[in-house]
Design a protein with these regions (language model features):
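Residue-level recognition of tetratricopeptide repeat
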Residues: 14, 47-48, 81, 115-117, ...
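Alpha-helical segment of the N-proximal tetratricopeptide repeat
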Residues: 11-49, 53, 60
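Structural marker of alpha-solenoid helical repeat scaffolds
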Residues: 10, 43-44, 77, 111-113, ...
Length: 166
């Protein structure tokens, strides 16, 4: 390993430490500290996760445009991570743009690296339910449950759609 690799590994390690500190601050609802630490993590070694989580904190403060910008930056860093696509869709929903959100939820479902595809399915279920496309909503709530069997909100949504369709 050459010196550059050593320095890169050290920066990556430091960024990871800052990321974990930021997440702890976020969990403690210390959003300003979390923002500061996520930004320092990104400055040290940019990752899609740090950009996505910084956006998440912005969303807690209703700073949706900044949250979307961070998610777009996350996608530029690593387009394989599914979280920023789903998050952009969620932020657009929060801004009242349900039509714009659909393509982002669908892109999340195509991302190769995502812990739980249940969330974009659930979000699509909500969008389709609001548009009164109950069959599509039921399908996505069901797919969310298939991905995450204990997903209570998806189960409730699916039951609600089943009662509407009967």
């Amino acid at each position: 390993m050459n010196r550059y690799d050593d320095a890169s590994d050290l920066r990556r390690y430091e960024a990871n430490q800052l990321f974990h500190e930021a997440y702890e601050a976020q969990q403690a609802n210390d959003y300003e500290r979390a923002i500061e630490l996520y930004k320092r993590s990104i400055e040290t070694y940019p990752t899609a996760e740090a950009h996505t989580f910084l956006g998440w904190v912005y969303s807690f403060q209703d700073r949706y445009d900044e949250a979307i910008e961070e998610c777009l930056e996350a996608i530029r860093v690593d387009e394989t991570l599914g979280n920023p696509y789903n998050d952009i869709g969620s932020y657009l929903l929060a801004k009242g743009d349900s039509y714009g959100s659909v393509r982002w939820f669908k892109r999340a479902l195509l991302a190769p690296r995502y812990e739980s595809y249940a969330f974009p399915h659930f979000n699509l279920g909500k969008v389709y339910e609001n548009r009164r496309k109950f069959l599509d909503a039921a399908r996505h709530y069901g797919l969310a449950l298939k991905q995450k069997p204990n997903f209570r909100e998806a189960a409730v949504g699916l039951r609600r759609m089943q009662s509407r369709l009967n």
